[in-house]
């Protein structure tokens, strides 16, 4: 049996995953990386993309817009700004996310925050194949 590490993924809305994984593929800001048991301690920021956790049950993919990943020899903890299981992502949800970002930009959110939200959604849309 392959060596495992604890993988936890949380967003402000909910905890999305807590499993023993053989590897976690992370869309890091400095490039993609794969964490496995025994990985050197690392903290990285996430870029918008697809995060994957491989476990005995198979591979589970999540669309993330950003956040942080803390990697140790025994685990990976991801704190995502926004995360959605890839299999739950559909055009209706994507349209709702775009509408939310547009609404936020029209109610006094500063320009940089609004532009980042729209940029994140564009990247999320591309990563999810929409």
UniProtKB/Swiss-Prot annotation:
Protein topology in the membrane: Peripheral membrane protein
Keywords from the UniProt entry: ATP synthesis, Cell inner membrane, Cell membrane, CF(1), Hydrogen ion transport, Ion transport, Membrane, Transport
UniProt-annotated location(s): Cell inner membrane
Annotated InterPro entries: ATP_synth_F1_dsu/esu, ATP_synth_F1_dsu/esu_N, ATPsynth_dsu/esu_N
Subunit structure and binding partners: F-type ATPases have 2 components, CF(1) - the catalytic core - and CF(0) - the membrane proton channel. CF(1) has five subunits: alpha(3), beta(3), gamma(1), delta(1), epsilon(1). CF(0) has three main subunits: a, b and c.
GO cellular component, one term: plasma membrane
Broad class of the protein's primary localization: membrane
Domain of life: Bacteria
Keyword Cell inner membrane: yes
Gene transcribed to yield this protein: atpC
Molecular-function GO term, any one: ATP binding
Name under which the protein is recorded: ATP synthase epsilon chain
Similarity section: Belongs to the ATPase epsilon chain family.
Protein task: Produces ATP from ADP in the presence of a proton gradient across the membrane.
């Amino acid at each position: 049996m392959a060596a495992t590490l604890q993988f936890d993924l949380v967003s402000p809305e909910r905890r999305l995953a807590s499993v023993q994984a053989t590897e976690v593929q992370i869309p890091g800001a400095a490039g993609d990386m794969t964490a496995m048991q025994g990985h050197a301690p690392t903290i990285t920021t996430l870029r918008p993309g697809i995060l994957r956790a491989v476990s005995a049950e198979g591979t589970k993919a999540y669309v993330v817009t950003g956040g942080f990943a803390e990697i140790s020899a025994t685990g990976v903890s991801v704190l995502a700004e926004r995360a959605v299981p890839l299999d739950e992502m559909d055009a209706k949800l994507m349209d709702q996310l775009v509408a939310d970002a547009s609404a936020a930009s029209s109610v006094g959110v500063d320009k940089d925050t609004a532009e980042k939200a729209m940029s994140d959604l564009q990247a999320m849309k591309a990563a999810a194949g929409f």
